[in-house]
């Protein structure tokens, strides 16, 4: 069934585009001559499709590299246990480096959130296309590429447009699975912790002020799922990890909170996330005899843990591939292809998805 047919059936049953969804979604669904409509019409989810990672170049490069080598699960039974093999063996990642729309936080700062939501939808649809541009100045998309079965966003700010993209794919009846840092972190918390648990969010101040975390927790509550209490801070990152954690806990105390933290969610791609350094920092607080440190000990619950966004994203991706039987089952190291999201001077500011010549394999 074509996208047009699905739209007609949906409207016939009284379903219309949600008033909260941006007009761009309605345009794609209704304009049969649009490029986006054509892409959706020709898309079929395939287990041999790529796993797209899209967003600012630095975040995307770091996240793609991590996903290619991470080993969190036993690939035979899916248990949380290292098995010495890459979790995404046999998979191909498609890294899309956005160089023209960054920094994403400027959309919020300038009060132009709708444009960012539209960009998220546009990127999602582009990942499904079977063609891309050979170069920045190419007039036509003539290079073949593999459509994606999953789209992972590497920026927390993209969360603002996830609902729009989800609505588009739901109404059209086709589309990839969408994964984001914020949703991955919040979903992990909702699965693991009871209502009333205190969760700390560690993120850049622009992320916290954008409201993407507040929206994600609110959506969980509206879905009828239990939601933990949460509070967010942005500690100074120009110190040792131990000092950063203490600074975070000091901010937590200064806000009037005394309830022990069950977990801290780290959603920050601007610095290397070091599990060992954080683990050592937690051990230092738990075991220190220094009276100045002792006051922080009571802020950490017995099962306190730190959850990083890259681990949460990897878990979300792995579980959905396993649940929906979308693994390729190829016996090979993960590999990646790369694309540049760029603009073309003199061509109306058109955004293009350009193939890069590099292709690499994790060894």
Language model regions located:
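Bacterial N-terminal signal peptides
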Residues: 1-6
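Non-catalytic structural scaffold of enzyme domains
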Residues: 8-363
């Amino acid at each position: 069934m074509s996208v047009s047919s699905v739209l007609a059936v949906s409207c016939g049953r009284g379903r219309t585009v949600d008033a909260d969804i941006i007009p761009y979604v309605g345009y794609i669904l209704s304009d049969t001559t649009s490029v986006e409509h054509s892409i959706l019409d020709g898309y079929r989810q395939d287990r041999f499709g790529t796993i797209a990672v899209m967003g600012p170049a630095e975040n995307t490069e770091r996240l793609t590299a991590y996903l290619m080598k991470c080993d969190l699960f036993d690939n035979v039974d899916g248990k949380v246990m290292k098995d010495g093999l890459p979790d995404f063996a046999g998979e191909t990642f498609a890294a899309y480096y956005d160089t023209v729309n960054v920094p994403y936080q400027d959309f919020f700062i300038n009060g132009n959130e709708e444009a960012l939501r539209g960009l998220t939808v546009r990127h999602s649809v582009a990942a499904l296309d079977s063609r891309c541009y050979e170069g920045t100045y190419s007039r036509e998309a003539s290079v073949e590429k593999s459509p994606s079965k999953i789209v992972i966003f590497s920026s927390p700010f993209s969360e603002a447009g996830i609902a729009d993209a989800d609505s588009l794919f739901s109404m059209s009846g086709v589309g990839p699975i969408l994964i984001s840092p914020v949703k991955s972190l919040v979903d992990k918390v909702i699965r693991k912790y009871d209502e009333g648990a205190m969760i700390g969010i560690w993120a850049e101040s622009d992320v916290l002020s954008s409201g993407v975390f507040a929206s994600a927790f609110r959506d969980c509550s509206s879905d009828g799922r239990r939601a933990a209490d949460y509070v967010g801070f942005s500690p100074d990152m120009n110190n040792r990890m131990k000092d950063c954690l203490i600074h975070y806990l000091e901010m937590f105390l200064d806000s009037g909170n005394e309830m022990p933290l069950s977990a801290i969610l780290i959603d920050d791609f601007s610095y290397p996330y070091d599990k060992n350094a954080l683990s050592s920092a937690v051990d230092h607080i738990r075991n220190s005899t220094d009276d100045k440190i002792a006051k922080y000990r009571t802020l950490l619950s017995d099962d306190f843990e730190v959850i990083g966004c890259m681990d949460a994203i990897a878990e979300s991706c792995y579980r959905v591939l396993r649940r929906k039987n979308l693994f390729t089952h190829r016996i090979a190291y993960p590999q990646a292809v790369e694309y540049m999201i760029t603009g073309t001077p003199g061509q109306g500011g058109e955004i293009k998805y350009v193939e890069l010549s590099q292709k690499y394999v994790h060894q």
